């Protein structure tokens, strides 16, 4: 189980009344980017790739290019007169105590806490007498705060803990084991762990996942064969036992293990892509027992939730696109023997085992609905939530009679509630001391029609009394992929934005998981254009309803959302004033050749699949659709030099292409964070700096000369 607190990224908008104008009257004199003669051939079609050399993250030439681009970008940003004022505002508002939902391990209650501006949140604990102490402080792991804490997993009795750390934002992790009572390190540090959970087998050892060390650069070389290992405490990592994966017949990119609470069964999930998995069962009490196949198809997702003796419970979308909870006996765990415990409904379901109950977390139009069931599948109660928004948490051991959950939305700072599992009685456990009154703001859910008539939900959040005059600076944020659901969460910067009259809008695009597998699939492969059409239609809705106008509309997204921004800013440049693609997947013909990129083929397809797939990808790939003679929105591309999820070469090449072909005076800049990765674990100080730059850039290019 992962317990984390990641402060939300901050974004700032400021209302302005004057007519916006071009803040950059002079043509930009960008650093020169060398072009070479690299050409690839796909199904007889030649595709030039003149910036291929920027893919070499270890070359001196690439390092010099990064230095020159950063100097140019920071020089531009430093001249914006209110950039420092925005940073100070962010720091002031960020500086409040944040706490995560508590959880019990052994004789202690643990929780994450950030005193305000700490670079990384700290894991604290209290004993039964209420005495508080620091358990793990990642701020001590490095001088600059760039080493972060990842997975933290306790053994079932809470006496041992294994945790993973990331350096410089990398997906590669190191693993450390502690005696939880004394905090003494046990054994050696494990290395080369990636995309891994930790599953304890009693107090003897644990299962974890990794790839072989890649040939070439660790930051960009392809990683393909995921493997599950067992580490026995007190033995060197080189002696770890390979449990699953690594053979020619088992070419899985994502392998993970889960152990039942009674340490009787090991469940192995194996996947080729980010959607769909096979599930296997191993009897840990019988070393000679064969590996049992539970599901043997990659067309659905199935995961182990809990067991009651020999009765196993699984969450699955097999023959149930919105999800259901099923049970089966360990002797016959295959789908043909499954029995529904909580059947599929029209709303998307995810399940947690909490105490001696199941908590069903439904998404109703991308908003939380929580129901409590017993192990017979009988409804106990629906949990009453404070408002519309997002509820999380609901962790509890079998021996516990209460649980904690968090609640938040775009205008509601996260609060923690304590719930009695037997009676359902709920009380406020913790409330942040932040000078923000949610009653002054409104989150409104609207539904608009996309290009093909599909109804798409969107949350629009703003200060009550806003004027619908088309002059409100507006940030339209999107993702639309990988079955990821965008549910309402609070951020300090959005609060500032709304205080000053700004609008924050988040549509739930196809490709996400808001309406189950069918909604996800409708935004994948040769239906990816649906995602872009949904986002463009959201922009049109905001403009038509007078929330904003093209001169006051900025768009932002990260990772797959960076692809969304890159594609839509090229397809409809006249709709947007500012574009902010972050750590984006921007070269759709080569994305699958880097690190874990091949695992994204379920959503994208690859240029090697077929001529038709190649042509489709080429038709929207941001890198390959920049045209001369077009004035694109003012663009600030952001990436990290240690991003080994979506390698920075995507952003490097896209920036070079845009700078070479941009017409007009809207700037094309790239901001490359050093010693930083894909985003998770980014220090608070770096996050504030980046958001100050993003918002200063946005406002300056909307024509704002000074802050109100």
For the regions a language model picked out, list residue spans one by one.
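Beta-propeller blade signature
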Residues: 125-126, 176-180, 224-234, 280-284, ...
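A conserved hydrophobic secondary-structure block that centers on an alpha-helix together
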Residues: 134-197, 203
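Hydrophobic beta-strand positions that form the internal "hydrophobic ladder"
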Residues: 109, 158-161, 206-207, 266, ...
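Non-catalytic accessory segments flanking enzyme active sites
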Residues: 60-153, 164, 253-283, 288-307, ...
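Active-site-proximal cap/loop segments of hydrolase catalytic domains
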Residues: 506-708
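C-terminal motif of bacterial Sec signal peptides marking the signal peptidase cleavage site
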Residues: 13-15
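A flexible loop/linker signature enriched in serine peptidases of the S9 family
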Residues: 114-121, 142-146, 165-174, 189-194, ...
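Cap/lid segment of the alpha/beta-hydrolase catalytic domain
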Residues: 139-155, 165-170, 184, 419-425, ...
């Amino acid at each position: 189980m992962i317990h984390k607190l990641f402060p939300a990224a901050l974004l700032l908008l400021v209302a302005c009344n004057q007519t916006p104008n071009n803040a950059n009257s002079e043509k930009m004199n960008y650093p020169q980017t060398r072009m070479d003669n690299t050409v690839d051939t796909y199904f007889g079609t030649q595709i030039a790739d003149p910036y291929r050399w920027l893919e070499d993250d270890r070359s001196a030439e690439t390092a010099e290019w990064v230095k020159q681009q950063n100097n140019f970008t920071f020089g531009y940003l430093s001249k914006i007169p209110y950039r420092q004022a925005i940073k100070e505002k962010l720091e002031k508002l960020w500086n409040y105590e944040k706490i995560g939902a508590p959880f019990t391990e052994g004789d202690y209650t643990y929780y994450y806490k950030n005193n305000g501006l700490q670079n990384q949140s700290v894991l604290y604990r209290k004993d039964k007498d209420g005495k508080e102490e620091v358990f793990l402080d990642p701020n001590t792991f490095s001088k600059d705060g760039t080493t972060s804490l990842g997975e933290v997993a306790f053994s079932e009795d809470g006496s041992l803990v294994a945790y993973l750390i990331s350096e410089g934002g990398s997906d590669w992790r190191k693993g450390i084991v502690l005696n939880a009572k004394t905090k003494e390190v046990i054994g050696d540090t494990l290395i080369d762990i990636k995309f891994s959970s930790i599953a304890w087998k009693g107090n003897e050892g644990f299962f974890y996942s990794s790839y072989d060390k890649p040939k070439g650069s660790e930051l960009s070389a392809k990683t393909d064969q995921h493997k599950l290992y067992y580490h026995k405490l007190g033995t060197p990592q080189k002696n770890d036992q390979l449990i699953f994966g690594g053979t020619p017949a088992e070419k899985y990119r994502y392998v993970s293990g889960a152990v039942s609470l009674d340490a009787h069964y090991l469940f192995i999930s194996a996947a080729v892509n980010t959607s769909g998995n096979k599930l296997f069962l191993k009897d840990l009490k019988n070393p000679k027992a064969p590996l049992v196949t539970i599901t043997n198809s990659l067309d659905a997702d199935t995961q182990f939730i809990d067991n009651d003796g020999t009765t196993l419970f699984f969450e699955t979308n097999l023959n149930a696109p919105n999800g259901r909870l099923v049970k089966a006996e360990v002797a016959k765990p295959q789908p043909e023997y499954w029995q529904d415990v909580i059947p599929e409904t029209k709303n998307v379901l995810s399940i947690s085992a909490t105490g001696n109950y199941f908590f069903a977390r439904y998404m109703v139009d991308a908003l939380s609905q929580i129901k409590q069931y017993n192990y017979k599948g009988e409804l106990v109660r629906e949990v009453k939530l404070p408002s519309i928004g997002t509820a999380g948490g609901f962790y509890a051991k079998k021996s516990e009679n209460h649980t904690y959950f968090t609640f938040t939305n775009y205008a509601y700072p996260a609060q923690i509630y304590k719930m009695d599992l037997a009676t359902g009685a709920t009380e406020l456990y913790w409330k942040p001391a932040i000078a923000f009154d949610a009653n002054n703001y409104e989150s409104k859910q609207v539904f608009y029609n996309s290009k093909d008539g599909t109804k798409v939900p969107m949350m629009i959040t703003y200060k009550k009394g806003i004027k619908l005059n088309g002059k409100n600076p507006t940030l339209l944020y999107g993702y639309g992929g990988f079955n990821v659901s965008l549910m309402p969460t609070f951020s300090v910067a959005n609060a500032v934005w709304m205080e000053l009259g700004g609008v924050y809008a988040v549509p739930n695009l196809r490709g996400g998981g808001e309406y189950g597998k069918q909604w996800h699939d409708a935004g994948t492969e040769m239906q990816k254009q649906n995602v872009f059409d949904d986002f463009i239609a959201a922009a049109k809705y905001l403009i038509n309803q007078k929330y904003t106008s093209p001169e006051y509309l900025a768009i932002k997204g990260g990772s797959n959302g960076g692809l969304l921004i890159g594609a839509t800013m090229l397809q409809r440049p006249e709709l947007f004033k500012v574009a902010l693609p972050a750590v984006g997947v921007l070269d759709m013909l080569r994305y699958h050749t880097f690190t874990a990129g091949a695992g994204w083929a379920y959503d994208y397809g690859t240029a090697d699949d077929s001529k038709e797939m190649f042509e489709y990808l080429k038709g929207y790939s941001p890198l390959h659709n920049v045209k001369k003679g077009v004035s694109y929105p003012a663009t600030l591309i952001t990436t990290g030099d240690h991003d080994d999820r979506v390698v920075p070469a995507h952003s490097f090449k896209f920036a070079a292409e845009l700078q070479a072909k941009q017409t007009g005076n809207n700037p094309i800049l790239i901001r490359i964070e050093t010693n930083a990765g894909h985003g998770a674990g980014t220090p608070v100080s770096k996050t504030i700096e980046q958001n100050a730059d993003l918002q200063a850039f946005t406002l300056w290019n909307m024509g704002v000369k000074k802050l109100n």
